[in-house]
């Protein structure tokens, strides 16, 4: 029984580590996003990313380290 609990705890630690590594990769400076401030939904990013104005960027709201961030997709 104790061995089973130890395996579950170890698995949870490994999974949380992998999630942290993935979120760090999302905020990588070499990505196709230009991060421009906080958001709750993608519509919050339209003004800061210049959606519907040349050069017609796309915007999404992605999870960051502490909150959601606007990701202006570079074309």
UniProtKB/Swiss-Prot annotation:
Domain of life: Eukaryota
Originating organism: Arabidopsis thaliana
Signal peptide region: 1-23
Location in the cell: Secreted
Keywords recorded for this protein, A-Z: Antimicrobial, Disulfide bond, Fungicide, Plant defense, Secreted, Signal
Lineage: Eukaryota, Viridiplantae, Streptophyta, Embryophyta, Tracheophyta
A biological process term (GO) from this entry: killing of cells of another organism
Any one annotated GO CC term: extracellular region
Record-given protein name: Putative defensin-like protein 271
InterPro entries on file: DEFL
């Amino acid at each position: 029984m104790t061995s089973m609990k130890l395996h579950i705890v170890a698995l949870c630690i490994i999974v949380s580590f992998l999630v942290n590594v993935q979120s760090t990769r999302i905020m990588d400076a070499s990505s196709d996003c230009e991060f421009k401030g906080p958001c709750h939904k993608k519509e919050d990013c339209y003004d800061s990313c210049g959606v519907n104005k040349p050069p017609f960027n796309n915007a999404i709201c992605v999870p960051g380290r502490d909150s959601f961030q606007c990701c202006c997709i570079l074309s």
